[in-house]
Amino acid sequence: MKNNFYQEDELLSNELSNRGFLLTKVDDVIGWARANSLWPMTFGLACCAVEMMQAAASRYDMDRFGMLFRPSPRQSDLMIVAGTLTNKMAPALRKVYDQMAEPKWVLSMGSCANGGGYYHFSYSVVRGCDRIVPVDVYVPGCPPTAEALIYGLMQLQKKIKRTTGFKYDARQTH
C-alpha cells in the first residue's frame, strides 16, 4: 500500500503529463510549498536530541522531505523541542520562538518535552513545553525513535497542507 504523499505526487505527475497543465487553488499551492520546505531549528535539550540528529543523518535523511536545519531562528519556521525543559531554560525557549518568522510551527519531541517525563515532579522542570510555546505536534517516547520523529514531521506536513489562506494559525485548524 502506497503512502498518501506518494499517491498525491503520482496523481500530480499523471495530470501534468496528460494535459500539460495543472488546475489548482492558490491555497493548495501555498500549503504544498510550506509543507515541503520546512526549515527546522533544533532546540535539543537532552537525549532526544541524539535521536533528532539520527533522523537527520544519512539513514533517515530528513532532507528528502525538503527539510534543511537552520542555525538561526530568523531563518527557520519549525522548532523541534527535544528533551527536558527546565525553568531556567524556558525564557530562552520563548525568546527563540518569538524570533522565528511567521508562519511558525512547534514539534514537541519526547516525554520530557511533552509533559515533564521522568523528571515531572522535579522543582526545576517545566511540565510540558506547551506551557511556554504553542505546540502543533507531539511525538511520544523516551526517547522517541527517529522513525517516530519522521512520522511526527509527516503529520505536521499534513496539517500544514490542510490550511487555507495566507495567514496561518495551526492551533485553529482541526
Swiss-Prot record:
It is an enzyme of class 7 (translocase). The keyword Transmembrane helix does not apply. Binds 1 [4Fe-4S] cluster. InterPro entries: NADH_UbQ_OxRdtase-like_20kDa, NADH_UQ_OxRdtase_20Kd_su. Its cofactor is [4Fe-4S] cluster. GO terms for biological process: aerobic respiration; electron transport coupled proton transport. [4Fe-4S] cluster binds at residues 47-48, 112, 142. GO terms for cellular component: plasma membrane; respiratory chain complex I. Its EC number is 7.1.1.-. It catalyses: a quinone + NADH + 5 H(+)(in) = a quinol + NAD(+) + 4 H(+)(out). It comes from the Bacteria. NDH-1 is composed of 14 different subunits. Subunits NuoB, C, D, E, F, and G constitute the peripheral sector of the complex. This is NADH-quinone oxidoreductase subunit B. The gene is nuoB.
